[in-house]
């Protein structure tokens, strides 16, 4: 999932070096840390529910109802929803409240084009810089993905969500040695938007996608970034074409 910056607390310069009493530690530090932890956990749950399609496009996110579903305060949920709105996963409707962002073929194409641009650029840098540890990550990630793809090809879709996580992990491993944390963070956030469409459309191309993933693994070990870029373009564009031609937009 996309890396998120955690909230920092300004240092207490006036009392630096002075030990807190045990009572003060309980009343001042623990609640703040606990509140931050609960907020982060809830944020991840809401985000995952949107990305994996458990919260449908256009679904109203009534704060009172969501408070019961997620066990969080209304103020916490409002902050989370505003944050997800800034990422484009939720739409803030002013006095009307919040709803899950809508989907469209044009939005999917734009997301896919940006993913292709970022991923192809990162592949070159990663293939040129990757070491043996990087190779190991690529091979291990591919093994996990291929195992679940084989089950999917046999008609077992019970672990589709896990397969999608492994799919992300493999593509992330391929570009993980690119040397740019900013690029990786941008790619991760964009990939989640792309993943939302994959989950909603429940698209799996079977043998072609399995072959493409295997080729990407092999090209990584051969450091053939040009061939990997070509496969990546086909990989993304063919998947988008299948999603656009499906019945996702008529649901």
Question: Which ranges hold each PLM region?
Answer:
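Hydrophobic residues in alpha-helical segments
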Residues: 50, 126-127, 149-153, 178, ...
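Alpha-helix boundary/capping and short turn/kink residues
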Residues: 55, 105, 116, 128-135, ...
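C-terminal regulatory/effector modules of DNA-binding transcriptional regulators
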Residues: 2-6, 69, 200-251
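Alpha-helix N-cap/N′ positions at the starts of helices
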Residues: 41, 95, 118, 140, ...
